[in-house]
Amino acid sequence: MAAAMSSSCCASSLRLIPFKRTLFSSIHYPAKTLLLRPLKPSEVPSFRRTIITFQKISTGIVPPPSASSSPSSYGDLQPIEELPPKLQEIVKLFQSVQEPKAKYEQLMFYGKNLTPLDSQFKTRENKVEGCVSQVWVRAFFDEERNVVYEADSDSVLTKGLAALLVKGLSGRPVPEILRITPDFAVLLGLQQSLSPSRNNGLLNMLKLMQKKALHLEVKGEEDSSSGESSESSFVSIPETKDEANVPEVDLESKPDLVEDLGTEKIDDSESGSNVVALGSRGMRIREKLEKELDPVELEVEDVSYQHAGHAAVRGSAGDDGETHFNLRIVSDAFQGKSLVKRHRLIYDLLQDELKSGLHALSIVAKTPAEV
């Protein structure tokens, strides 16, 4: 009996052992087969080849951004065509040079060839603030009321930057100079050649030059208020320009400036033949001002015929040669604004016309209370 039980237990245990071995063996065997990787070696090189192929494709995409000399690659920056002609030439010259060192050497060349500024003009008023080196800029009108600049610096490199601006801006009318935005510095591609402080110095020079041009324009308007008739140039201020740099004109302290600017009338009885009906540009100007300013009084007078000797005569600038206008606007929109800011508002509204052949405006901008 005991033997039978013993054999039974043994048999039972013997049956369990093979079962357990079989169980673990069956579990372990597939694990061993999973460790066999007959396909892995062939797959890995294929995967790596895919990565290499992708890298080669991405490498081919890199060159277009480096071809930054193309104006179209600058996106929303100010178009080169809006810059003064000489400044356009300089920008294109720098864009054609890929090596930063070559651009640096060109600046040095400009600096060495810049005519020194007379010491009497190296004053605090002419000094550019925020530059690493000392820089002075002087501005004055030539006989045709174009701005002429002179500059100097105690650093050859900074002198080169000043010379670049003097060369690019001199001989141009005030509106062209004031339309320039800081974008032109990006178009030059000098970021790799100059330190951040030098780049900021270049922009500070531009701001002072624009400020001086605006001062000349305002002074010219003050002189014209003496009663002498003279050609009036428009004042346009770029949006990127800091308002802190724009001189304010107190209307109360200078009433004659508002009263006499561009108010010369044409006597219909004596000069009826000179009265010009508004053409397409004149009508657009009138409609724009009526819509945006809701004026109490609005006069738009085409005086382009008075400037027959000007570069833009009738028929040469599109819109039947409509290039010069007298504007008289009485509107509540001018309330609390200085003369300069009133001009700025008007020219912001007429930007499309300014870009398409409008050369000059004589503006009288008043509030109803000032009439």
Swiss-Prot record:
InterPro entries: BolA, BolA-like_sf, Fe-S_metab-assoc_dom
Family statement: Belongs to the SufE family.
Species this protein is from: Arabidopsis thaliana (Mouse-ear cress)
GO cellular component terms listed in the entry, alphabetical order: chloroplast; chloroplast stroma; cytosol; mitochondrion
Pathway, per record: Cofactor biosynthesis; iron-sulfur cluster biosynthesis
GO biological process: embryo development ending in seed dormancy
Gene: SUFE1
Function, as annotated: Participates in cysteine desulfurization mediated by NFS2 in chloroplast and NIFS1 in mitochondrion. Activates the cysteine desulfurase activity of NFS2. Cysteine desulfurization mobilizes sulfur from L-cysteine to yield L-alanine and supplies the inorganic sulfur for iron-sulfur (Fe-S) cluster formation. Glutaredoxins regulate SUFE1 activity by inducing its reduction and deglutathionylation.
Residue numbers spanned by region Disordered: 218-249
Expression (tissue specificity): Expressed in roots, leaves, stems and flowers.
Protein name: SufE-like protein 1, chloroplastic/mitochondrial
Transit peptide: 1-66
Active site: 131 (cysteine persulfide intermediate)
Recorded GO MF terms: enzyme activator activity
Lineage: superkingdom: Eukaryota
Further comment found in the protein's record: Over-expression of SUFE1 leads to retarded growth and chlorosis.
Quaternary data: Heterotetramer with NFS2. Interacts with NFS2 and NIFS1. Interacts in vitro with GRXS14, GRXS15, GRXS16 and GRXS17, but not with GRXC5. Interacts in vivo only with GRXS14 and GRXS16.
Annotated compartments: Plastid, Chloroplast stroma; Mitochondrion
Residues with PTM S-glutathionyl cysteine: 131
Keywords in alphabetical order: Chloroplast, Glutathionylation, Mitochondrion, Plastid, Transit peptide
Claim: Chloroplast is one of the keywords in the record: yes
Pfam families: BolA, SufE
